[in-house]
Curated annotation (Swiss-Prot):
<feature type="modified residue" description="Phosphoserine">
    <location>
        <position position="181"/>
    </location>
</feature>
<dbReference type="GO" id="GO:0005737">
    <property type="term" value="C:cytoplasm"/>
</dbReference>
<protein>
    <recommendedName>
        <fullName>WW domain-binding protein 11</fullName>
    </recommendedName>
</protein>
<feature type="modified residue" description="Phosphoserine">
    <location>
        <position position="364"/>
    </location>
</feature>
<keyword id="KW-1017">Isopeptide bond</keyword>
<feature type="region of interest" description="Disordered">
    <location>
        <begin position="588"/>
        <end position="620"/>
    </location>
</feature>
<dbReference type="Pfam" id="PF09429">
    <property type="entry name" value="Wbp11"/>
</dbReference>
<keyword id="KW-0539">Nucleus</keyword>
<feature type="compositionally biased region" description="Pro residues">
    <location>
        <begin position="192"/>
        <end position="210"/>
    </location>
</feature>
<feature type="region of interest" description="Required for nuclear export">
    <location>
        <begin position="633"/>
        <end position="641"/>
    </location>
</feature>
<feature type="compositionally biased region" description="Basic and acidic residues">
    <location>
        <begin position="276"/>
        <end position="304"/>
    </location>
</feature>
<feature type="compositionally biased region" description="Low complexity">
    <location>
        <begin position="381"/>
        <end position="404"/>
    </location>
</feature>
<feature type="modified residue" description="N6-acetyllysine">
    <location>
        <position position="565"/>
    </location>
</feature>
<dbReference type="GO" id="GO:0006397">
    <property type="term" value="P:mRNA processing"/>
</dbReference>
<keyword id="KW-0488">Methylation</keyword>
<comment type="function">
    <text>Activates pre-mRNA splicing. May inhibit PP1 phosphatase activity.</text>
</comment>
<keyword id="KW-0007">Acetylation</keyword>
Amino acid sequence: MGRRSTSSTKSGKFMNPTDQARKEARKRELKKNKKQRMMVRAAVLKMKDPKQIIRDMEKLDEMEFNPVQQPQLNEKVLKDKRKKLRETFERILRLYEKENPDIYKELRKLEVEYEQKRAQLSQYFDAVKNAQHVEVESIPLPDMPHAPSNILIQDIPLPGAQPPSILKKTSAYGPPARAVSILPLLGHGVPRLPPGRKPPGPPPGPPPPQVLQMYGRKVGFALDLPPRRRDEDMLYSPELAQRGHDDDMSSTSEDDGYPEDMDQDKHDDSTEDSDTDRSDAESDGDEFGHREDSERDNTEEKKSGLSVRFADMPGKSRKKKKNMKELTPLQAMMLRMAGQEIPEEGREVEEFSEEEDADDSDDSEAEKQSQKQHKDDGHSDSTAAASSQQQAPPQSAPASQIQAPPMPGPPPLGPPPAPPLRPPGPPTGLPPGPPPGAPPFLRPPGMPGIRGPLPRLLPPGPPPGRPPGPPPGPPPGLPPGPPPRGPPPRLPPPAPPGIPPPRPGMMRPPLVPPLGPAPPGLFPPAPLPNPGVLSAPPSLIQRPKADDASAATIEKKATATISAKPQITNPKAEVTRFVPTALRVRRENKGATAVPQRRSEDDSAVPVAKAAPRSGPSVAVSVQTKDDVYEAFMKEMEGLL
């Protein structure tokens, strides 16, 4: 160790004279105290117990090599602690090596024992940790020792009888060589199949009749009479028959709103069916087919309407059961949609007449009920009016299944029953377009013998050349008959041939219907010449009652909607019947629409087909194209400029 100059630091930097003097004094002091300091260090080492140091190191090892619990201290901290303890123990060894060799030998034995214990702990810890991460497949299996000769090999399958591998699934239809090797061993007690092998499945083909008879009662499988078995399961007793029929009809009777009396009728029908089915073992499907055919023939002979029932049942008991429970209008509508016969309570809802439906085979059921209502029931006009609102033809679209609840209407304004207010709300949806070959629904307006009000004529189908779009006609779910007042359906009226239909955003239905002359021989006035003018906006729900009966009825017809598919007997004749009236009304009153347009011009910058004032008798424009709207707009601008 070389001597450094006192005039510079360790790095060679020059020191101040004061610092140089202090450094020299310190050196002299250290030289004097070196012996004393060495004696102090030796005394401190002698005060320490080497056995306690060994025990501390063992605790650290147990903490480090514990396979169950993670060490509380970090691995680096454990190493530092062990290092310090080890250095201290080594200094003690050096101290006693010089001063007391006997103690030095004892301390060496303690150190060797400690190292052995630490090695065992480390080995155990590594074994446990490796066992947790090792894979079973990687462990080598020991060699199998030779089996002693005194073991009986009766139950041990020979190599020819044992499966080739435990990982392969051999087929039951494999080569029979394995079975042949087993055959000589059958007499010696060897099982036919080796342990773990499953016998092959049943042979292909239908099971023998003995098996069928054995399991026929449990499983219900009979090869010769499956319909009879199904009938016995369903219709073994009247209770089971009722349950079976109710289960068959549960989806329609519950979802479509069938009344409970229909279920009672089905119960009576099913009890009769159960008696007959037990005797002749016919299937329900055949009986229902025969019953529907016979009932269809009966209803065609009656010419009063279809009455599709699910079993033949006398009408008297059916009427008795129907009088037991009231039928809501929604249930009556659903019954008609499903083709069921309407009970007596539901017949009060009908407004159809028989003469209108002489040619209609699909819609004749509702008109049959209307005829019975006019002949048998002498209800007041208000009752008929309230019920007229709640009915819908059976051909209504599925969107009409959700109908608003009935509301009490105003007193009738004339001898024919007038419908009440329609519940406010948006239209229930667009009706489907007229199907090709739809059954006739319309009659000539002047046909004699009409009893009660003529239902509102259906709009004509789409004329030839019209681009595809929403089909004309009112939304489903509203009564045919004199239309009730209410918010309008947002449907454009059907366009005549040659005029493209207006876009939905460019026009609204007019507010007031045209006051054209009614066809002769009708009371109340005939339906609108243009059946597309369906309704008015909600501002015209309340009309002044000072109007005469004719005006009030026509005003109500403006807001009417009917919920049947458009059905036309002669499309060309029916379409051309209404076209000239609609065109004439539009051309005569084109100037009358300028007043509301000019009045609302400041509110909306887009020209829209407005309607005439509410109280005036002027007729609104029924069909307007872009050219008509633009022409009216230019006239307004000329008047303003």
